[in-house]
């Protein structure tokens, strides 16, 4: 333990620092002094020499000595603040130049220590510290010192209440600094300093930004960030939104209106119309900002004073100006509602007159504006009178729009019928409807019918009286209107009003003659297709010879293939229903018979391998040649050859070229991995020219089973395979190759092929991607020829139906085992042969890892940063040359804790579409850490499960991240201690309100408590099932689980109730019948019956499974 400092010890330290001795000795002595300062009071006589000694150490050129001296100086400041502030004021100000210099140091640690020292010294000497920061650090040439001083200024304002007004001119200059990082820090500092500042301060900031000519991008970013977070509520989104503009004082608002008045005086001219449009747009921006909320009355007063000018803009012949004026009135109505009642009279007159304009845009905008005004302002009889006048207008457009205004009025006042009736509005509504139903224009009549049925829902007796007053034709049309709840007609079948009963407006009633003939031809072609025989010999002609196969195929029938869109869209009526293009008839499986029929079955595509065509085809199609048919997936040649004893007939692809049977090892594409998937479409001609190394048996006396050899096609190096013409993925041609006997290989040519190399038996293996530069060489050792094991052939019934992919499952399992073995071998080779990290790479990774952990804790790491962090985590498995681990325990704990905090945080600063991508990367990083360091994850299991449940509350079940959350929760539940998990999850889930969860699912504001609750119950059930008999809950754990399940059984949400029932079933399997029902004795009878049903169901399933395994 260190001792109290003495004068001799400090004097010796000063002498040692000035002497020419080793750095380690100096660092050791400074460290001793630092320990004494941290643990003991500094004697008054030693304060000045200690300051001198530490100043010497901090001014050294050696980093180790500077680190020791500057940290000791910081501890000395902290000690003297409590021990002797007067001495710190005197001696600390002398150290200010050194501290300000360290603000610009290259190492971030020294910059942080300098900022901390300034914060400590500010408590005793604020004036001197501010002067040094403002006049030295902020105006110097060191960019790091400027950044650090800005951070310090913000920190002092938030913690000590530092007044920053004197710093504003300096910060304006830093906003235009040559260094980009300084500009960014200055912008963020200004935003944070003025975020909660009063309105006059923000107005002064805007003036300062203008005076210092700050670049517009920075200025707009600052002003936008300082805007209020909420704007005036709007029931409907504006068709063309504007950038919000904000004012901070009433005086500023008055200056804006005073400037606008001059633009709206007199008539519209070429000189003032653009200023008028800009003024109207400015008013819209103010409404979008804070004028209507923060300065409600003042802004409305200004608008009323400017109303004449706004109306001049509305009735302008310039479309853009008129459109802006209409949009302004709509936004005023939405923002103020009944507060604009005094302006309604003149506005209704103006806009109803404008609806009769010949310009479609102006008329439509006026209609929308009137509708918005009616829906927002207080109802009075004058509004209804304006609508009645519009119904009598000589122009058709106001009469057409009036029906929509009536519907808006009825929807708004349906719950206040008395007010409408007592003011005479009901009579006017009746007059409007009668006038519209008898209007000369059919469009007006049709629109008014919809209004009538809405009126009938509010005043049915009045509507019945109107109906009785109509003539028979008008009454029938009204009854058949689609808006009639009891209408026998639907809107799709009727003619459009005013257009007559033409063919273009009515659905076709019967198909045309041409379509009928086409349907008849399609029916005839389907009759010519023979049915699949139930036995051999039926409907099949003898096998074709080689010469017949080389002939070109016969011409297709003269039937024009129509595109699918024409078939679907050109017919109408009942008999001419849309027809899907004809598809090849699915044929039943060929029975495994004796004779050449099994050989001939290879000429036809199998039912399972033939995929749907890539484009629509009619049923009358060109007959396909045998050469273009895909090969049967499962080899059947071996059995048929052995059983029948007949020679095998080859199937050449074209005349003059030898053709062999499909090898069990297919030629894969270089870019496609060998996976087992459904077969694709038929191969194209370009894949029929593969060259094969074919062993030909020279002796015909050999047994058939010794003729069976596997061959491998050589991959064409110059072939470019595209997805459209690739026959199938590797490994699909013979999925049962490892489990079935090899296939007989034969070739037909005019001259026999001589084999100079002796043949060798080929071992059957799981298909793997071969190299494109190598081909399979087939040899046979004559010495081991007699020792070959004869494959045992399995005989079945002669007419047995054989599945094409009967051994696909065996192949899938073999492929999976081989891939796992390859991965293990690669990992072992990588561990054995991997190069160790160099010291430079290790330092870089350590720096990046520390930065990544810091950004994760601050929740500011983006998607690319997470991917880089994942790469560093993968590199952490590589052993460095220095022996120092990259991911230490402290860093691992900090990273895992930060990741889980990141996962459950809402990330409100990101856009919703980016939040889920970032969360997915957080999840991937956690999974990678769990995979790499599974043993170290044990202390974080409970915390991780809580974070996963909280994160689950945000996402719907269809979101892709939900499956990742559930899988990670299952892994953590299997890793952690079961007792701890039960207690932690039960305590967390019990705090969730079941009713709130159901309310949220029904559209309430309770959040996603129901989702978290459901997932938590699911995790507990899965853990109980996975642990099995190894985990039996104790009495306390059983009581907690039973209490949780009992509360969830009463939930209003079905998913929570179901998960609670399944948890009870799993709990019953662990604790037995007596303990289980004793724990659930407080549950109601209905849930108990449901639990009993599922318990019995599970017992039957377990019993049936046990019997099946025994059998």
UniProtKB/Swiss-Prot annotation:
One of its GO terms (molecular function) is microtubule binding. GO terms for cellular component: cytoplasmic microtubule; microtubule organizing center; mitotic spindle midzone; nucleus; spindle microtubule. Coiled coil: none annotated. Residues 225-245, 476-751 are annotated as: Disordered. The keyword Repeat applies. HEAT repeats lie at residues 95-133, 167-205. Residues 704-714 have a biased composition (Basic and acidic residues). The keyword Kinase does not apply. Keywords: Cell cycle, Cell division, Cytoplasm, Cytoskeleton, Microtubule, Mitosis, Nucleus, Repeat. Disulfide bonds: none annotated. One of its GO terms (biological process) is cell division. Pfam families: CLASP_N (PF12348). It is found in: Cytoplasm, Cytoskeleton; Nucleus; Cytoplasm, Cytoskeleton, Spindle. Residues 502-511 have a biased composition (Polar residues). InterPro entries: ARM-like (IPR011989), ARM-type_fold (IPR016024), CLASP_N_dom (IPR024395), TOG (IPR034085). Belongs to the CLASP family. Interacts with microtubules. PANTHER family: CLASP, CLIP-ASSOCIATING PROTEIN. Microtubule binding protein that promotes the stabilization of dynamic microtubules. Required for mitotic spindle formation. This is Protein STU1. The lineage of its organism: Eukaryota, Fungi, Dikarya, Ascomycota, Pezizomycotina.
